[in-house]
């Protein structure tokens, strides 16, 4: 269980990812749950196993009451369970005691957090509330499960040398020019530039999205251990905050998805939303592919430069839930700026 960091908060979903009164299954730290949202926007979660004969509740449907609340209905024998896990047995017309223990959810605006079945060992980061206040939601993408453990997933996301290998086919990155790493314990910021090889004109004409790729990618990654990495990017028409989320589904299976937010400087920026989402999806798919090609537990005999992000993840993972004195800051850039409108 320690490999899934019990006591850490996990962002299970954004409300935009849920359809009203449509059950959805998800896994967290070795347990399966069903989640649903009623017409009032209230979100509930129960164990996904029907206590009668074990059917998957997420394969059922929702029934709505006159007051707008809803229940999830088992697809096997049509037993309906309310948000507390109670049901009414046929012929009794009386609600039972709870047959399941609801999963505690912490709703912050449209963000649905949970500590699973564990007592909180760290606070929920507030940065996404700031992002939602100053940016508009473009959408979500790349919601997939990858057959890898949480630590390996996090090491990949904080490996500042992997872009010119893993993401070569899209960005054609030629080198990593690392500038600064700011270690603030469970929060960190990384700044680096990624020069890219140019696409030819006929390649761009065949794929117009490529016109958006800059000659040099100026990367600012804002990291909130263990569940969130935000790529802050800017184009002439606006800014983007590409939020990568991570959730340990089981010891060797990790879910990831992207929430994309934008801040427009030009009306045309709103037309580019699907393009930015497509780029995000390709990035996640490339990461998933390389993670499927690793030999697990192979010893690292070579150490590259700019591996400070890996060291940061390993330190926090090993010491969790204790906070270790920050000791990995390097570089001479100014401190990270606060979120502004």
Where in this protein do the model-derived segments appear?
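Hydrophobic, proline/glycine-rich low-complexity stretches
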Residues: 1-8
């Amino acid at each position: 269980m320690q490999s899934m960091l019990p006591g850490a908060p996990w962002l299970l979903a954004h409300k935009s990812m849920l359809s009203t009164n449509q059950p959805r299954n998800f896994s967290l730290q070795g347990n399966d749950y069903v989640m649903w949202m009623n017409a009032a926007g209230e979100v509930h979660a129960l164990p996904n196993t029907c206590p009668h004969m074990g059917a998957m509740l997420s394969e059922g449907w929702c029934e709505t009451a006159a007051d707008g609340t809803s229940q999830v209905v088992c697809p096997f024998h049509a037993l309906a369970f309310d948000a507390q896990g109670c049901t009414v047995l046929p012929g009794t017309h009386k609600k039972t005691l709870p047959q399941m223990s609801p999963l505690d959810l912490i709703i912050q605006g449209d963000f649905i957090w949970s500590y699973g079945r564990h007592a909180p060992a760290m606070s929920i980061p507030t940065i996404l509330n700031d992002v939602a206040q100053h940016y508009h939601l473009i959408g979500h993408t790349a919601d997939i499960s990858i057959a890898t453990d949480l630590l390996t997933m996090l090491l990949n996301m904080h490996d500042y040398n992997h872009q010119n290998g893993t993401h070569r086919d899209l960005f054609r990155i030629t080198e990593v020019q690392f500038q600064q790493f700011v270690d603030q314990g469970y929060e960190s910021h990384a700044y680096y530039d990624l020069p890219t090889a140019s696409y030819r004109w006929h390649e761009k004409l065949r794929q117009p999205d490529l016109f958006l790729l800059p000659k040099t990618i100026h990367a600012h990654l804002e990291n909130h251990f263990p569940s969130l990495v935000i790529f802050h990017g800017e184009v002439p028409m606006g800014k983007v905050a590409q939020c990568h989320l991570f959730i340990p589904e089981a010891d060797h299976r990790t879910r990831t998805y992207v929430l994309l937010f934008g801040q427009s400087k030009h009306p045309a920026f709103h037309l580019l939303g699907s393009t930015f989402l497509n780029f995000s999806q390709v990035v996640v798919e490339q990461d998933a592919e390389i993670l499927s090609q690793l030999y697990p537990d192979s010893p690292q005999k070579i150490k590259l430069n700019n591996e400070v992000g890996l060291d940061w993840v390993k330190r926090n993972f090993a010491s969790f839930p204790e906070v270790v004195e920050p000791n990995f800051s390097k570089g001479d850039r100014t401190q990270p700026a606060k979120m502004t409108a």
